[in-house]
Amino acid sequence: MTTSRCSHLPEVLPDCTSSAAPVVKTVEDCGSLVNGQPQYVMQVSAKDGQLLSTVVRTLATQSPFNDRPMCRICHEGSSQEDLLSPCECTGTLGTIHRSCLEHWLSSSNTSYCELCHFRFAVERKPRPLVEWLRNPGPQHEKRTLFGDMVCFLFITPLATISGWLCLRGAVDHLHFSSRLEAVGLIALTVALFTIYLFWTLVSFRYHCRLYNEWRRTNQRVILLIPKSVNIPSNQQSLLGLHSVKRNSKETIV
């Protein structure tokens, strides 16, 4: 094992002045206590006279909060809801609340863990149409939906009454042998209903597309996992202690 001349003072980067040496990683346990806390020092020998990396990690004093695992999303413990370990993540990232995970999977529209890429067994249920009508999405989509609904409720009876009056007038003109006026009124009625149906169809297709997209990305996710993945309360403190010890031994290059 080859190392350069490096100082071992905690929280101070070593001063290395040795010549070029092959890259060698060394991890030392100084065995000393500073303020009652053990210090873990990692050194990497110099290459071409330059220090590659040095990490000093302090193992924090054990506390009741460090001994208990917590949800990696909300950072809360198991006082309100049991913690699960449904994927292959370990340590402090391996525990999570069921409700937090279901909410995250619903918001991200995914079915796998973003860290270990473990695919969860989930059941997706579409949300009802009433919920979309209450909250269709962004503000401009709300205004568009509200405006089109008002226009539809206002234009539909207006177009119906106008078409009926035009047809009634065309029939009266036919009785009085005024064919030109009757043809004009019939053409006006056809144009009126064509424009109305075209606008209704375009608006309906637009909002159906928004609803289908909202329904696809806002599904209710139910996590299908066995009860065996729940972390018993009598093992939570032991799990937290092991995770703290394991994290204290990690080093960074």
From Swiss-Prot:
Modification type Phosphoserine: residues: 237, 243
Protein name per its UniProtKB record: E3 ubiquitin-protein ligase MARCHF3
GO BP annotation list: endocytosis; protein ubiquitination
Catalytic reactions on record: S-ubiquitinyl-[E2 ubiquitin-conjugating enzyme]-L-cysteine + [acceptor protein]-L-lysine = [E2 ubiquitin-conjugating enzyme]-L-cysteine + N(6)-ubiquitinyl-[acceptor protein]-L-lysine
UniProt: Zn(2+) 1 binding residues: 71, 74, 97, 100
Binding site for Zn(2+) 2: 87, 89, 113, 116
Any one GO molecular-function label of the UniProt entry: ubiquitin-protein transferase activity
Entry EC number(s): 2.3.2.27
Keywords: Cytoplasmic vesicle, Endocytosis, Endosome, Membrane, Metal-binding, Phosphoprotein, Transferase, Transmembrane, Transmembrane helix, Ubl conjugation pathway, Zinc, Zinc-finger
Function: E3 ubiquitin-protein ligase which may be involved in endosomal trafficking. E3 ubiquitin ligases accept ubiquitin from an E2 ubiquitin-conjugating enzyme in the form of a thioester and then directly transfer the ubiquitin to targeted substrates.
Mode of membrane association: Multi-pass membrane protein
Keyword Ribosomal protein: no
Compartment(s) of residence: Cytoplasmic vesicle membrane; Early endosome membrane
Transmembrane segments: 145-165, 182-202
Summary of the tissues where the protein is detected: Expressed predominantly in lung, colon and spleen. Present in liver (at protein level).
Domain notes: The RING-CH-type zinc finger domain is required for E3 ligase activity.
Main localisation: membrane
Zinc finger (RING-CH-type): 63-123
